[in-house]
A protein has these predicted regions:
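Acidic/polar-rich alpha-helix caps and helix-coil junctions
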Residues: 1-48, 61, 69, 73-214
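Mobile gating loops/cap/lid regions near enzyme active sites that modulate substrate access
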Residues: 53-56
Length: 214
């Protein structure tokens, strides 16, 4: 069912894969399906862009989130997402998707068509989904890939999701739902689940026991 729902959006003429810089640099693009607009009044915005730049960067920010070292080398030079996704200044690495910085006027993109391509690809598997994966890669300036088996295909999809959705809140959930979090991040098994809130356990003892490890 996931691939059918994703394919229905891919077929919708209101949406299309767009140039990557337009997604985060222009309101006029056909790729974004759903996003929160940030208001201009002071104090009304969640200012997500403030989190990714240092105060010394021209965009200014609190620099609460920064890309891991391997992120800075995972993009091929011909990947059209590279300059929009990451940048470096004064030996500091930055996520570059939200350029309004401290002003916080960037929209918060929740869902866009590229995700539908990768959902469809993953749901269909190697035989049915490879074309969708490669269509997205070609749009982003990359060559087609030819994984030899389902495991390699899933790894290719997950890597593409990492490249496409850097700093958009997908990576942790991708690793957990595919059982790769402990291997990739070195987390313990119990950390892949949140604890049940003690308040809810108090009100509903039938929820006990808590998730393992808590």
């Amino acid at each position: 069912i996931r691939d059918r729902l994703a394919e229905s959006l891919i077929a919708n003429p209101n949406y299309a894969l767009d140039d990557f810089d337009k997604i985060f640099r222009s309101k006029a693009n056909k790729e974004v399906i759903f996003a929160f607009s940030c208001l201009t009044e002071d104090g009304s915005s969640i200012k997500i862009s403030n989190q990714f730049y240092s105060y010394n960067h021209p965009n200014k920010g609190s620099y609460n989130y920064r890309p891991a070292g391997d992120v800075m080398t995972m993009y091929a030079d011909n990947d059209l997402r590279k300059e929009v996704s990451i940048t470096t200044l004064d030996n500091l690495n930055f996520v570059n998707k939200y350029p309004s910085g401290q002003t916080g006027s960037d929209p918060v993109v929740i869902s866009r068509l590229a995700e539908m391509y990768l959902i469809s690809a993953e749901a269909q598997g190697l035989n049915g989904g490879l074309d969708r994966l490669n269509e997205l890669r070609e749009k982003r300036g990359l060559d087609r890939v030819s994984p030899g088996n389902e495991a390699d295909f899933l790894d290719a999809v997950l890597q593409e999701r990492r490249l496409e959705f850097l700093a958009e809140g997908f990576r942790w959930y991708d690793l957990v739902r595919t059982g790769k979090a402990t291997q990739t991040l070195g987390t313990k098994d119990y950390q892949c689940l949140m604890p049940l809130p003690s308040r809810e356990l108090l009100y509903n003892p039938n929820l006990k026991p808590n998730n393992p490890g808590y």
